[in-house]
Amino acid sequence: MERAAKKEAVEQLHEVFKTTGVAVVAHYSGLTVAQMQNLRKQMKQAGASVKVSKNRLAKIALEGTDVVGIGPLLKGPTVIATSNDPVAAPKVAIEFAKANEKFVILGGSMGSTVLNVDSVKALASLPSLDELRGKLVGLIQAPATKLAQLANAPAAKVARVIQAHASKGEAA
């Protein structure tokens, strides 16, 4: 790789690291090309991305970013999964690691907080931002629906009492 190409690669990686919400580092030694393509496809569907670069260039790109703490994890054949959603990259990485034993998660970073493997697994078990938003909307709508039911209930009761009284009058 020429010096200019290295500089451009570092700049691109730096932009990715600067804007990412979470980064997950894993070893990928022994994975086939098809498996790596599958990982990239799954990450893309989840709104995340996968980067494979020289560790030395990645360490340079990490400088001045929140995720600089993952630098010590960059040893050997590593892949870095990033996403803005704090759950997307960890969730896909954990699922992929379960299916492929050669994909070993080393740790990660969420903002300036360095994560170990257990923390990445815990993060992956959380619901995504979209799921949380859906639940929040449901919780907000539930009281309004209940209030509408309560407001209509007295009128319905009065109607049933009148209907019952009318039924008695016809029976007599």
Curated annotation (Swiss-Prot):
Pfam family membership, one: Ribosomal_L10
Matching Gene3D superfamilies: 3.30.70.1730, 6.10.250.290
One Gene Ontology cellular component: large ribosomal subunit
InterPro entries the UniProt entry points to: Ribosomal_uL10, Ribosomal_uL10-like_sf, Ribosomal_uL10_bac, Ribosomal_uL10_bac_type, Ribosomal_uL10_CS_bac
GO molecular-function term, one example from the UniProt record: structural constituent of ribosome
Keywords from the named record: Ribonucleoprotein, Ribosomal protein, RNA-binding, rRNA-binding
CDD domains given in the database record: Ribosomal_L10 (cd05797)
GO BP terms in the entry: translation
NCBIfam families attached to this UniProt entry: PRK00099.1-1
Family: Belongs to the universal ribosomal protein uL10 family.
Function: Forms part of the ribosomal stalk, playing a central role in the interaction of the ribosome with GTP-bound translation factors.
Summary of subunit composition and partner proteins: Part of the ribosomal stalk of the 50S ribosomal subunit. The N-terminus interacts with L11 and the large rRNA to form the base of the stalk. The C-terminus forms an elongated spine to which L12 dimers bind in a sequential fashion forming a multimeric L10(L12)X complex.
Protein name in UniProt: Large ribosomal subunit protein uL10
Organism: Bradyrhizobium sp. (strain ORS 278)
The organism's taxonomic lineage, starting at the top: Bacteria, Pseudomonadati, Pseudomonadota, Alphaproteobacteria, Hyphomicrobiales
